[in-house]
Amino acid sequence: DSLYDSPRAINGRHNFTITGQRASGNVIYRGYISNPIRSLAADFHAYLSMANLIDNLIIDNDRFEAADRSGAAGVAGFPKHGVTTTQSVFWNNEGLSYPLDRPAIIRSDQYGWGYIVGTRGPAFRVALGVSERTAPEDYLEGEGLGASLQPQSLYVDQLERRLLREGKANRWEAVREGL
């Protein structure tokens, strides 16, 4: 479990990539990705990373993929990539522009349920896929309506609720000032 607050990745090979079962429960909050090398999207890359949150990511000429990569060849004795994530959430992400070859800022084809709630900006489309390996189709709500989504950030909402429930109102006030 890791929290990445405001990370930036530009001109990278898979600007962000999350791989494997040990890389589960991660939060990417207020990040920025742009211009991947050879159109290689940011992604959940291989071996079922579970229950991650991509929250308020700005996507510029890039795309974030949560897809079945069973067809991706393994190398050097590693198995094929397989289904890459399940129960991961994309929350209120903003698209500035689409990659030339892909008219969506998010592609989701997660094992079981995946969730995409709220997108915004001039590039707001989501591509959903579903196969026998990943059914049912992931949940999509608020495509293009993220500006009016409540709460604006799932991470911030859950952090506030947790701290207040634990009687840590002073801690929440200090944290909120830094957001």
Name these PLM-found stretches.
Residues R63-G77:
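Acidic/polar low-complexity surface segments
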Residues N15, S39-L40, D62-A67, S97-I106:
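Acidic/polar loop patches that form or flank catalytic/metal-binding clefts of enzymes
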Residues W91, L96-L179:
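Long, contiguous C-terminal flanking segments immediately downstream of a protein's structured core
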Residues D1-T17, R22-R38, D43, L48-N61, ...:
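Right-handed parallel beta-helix
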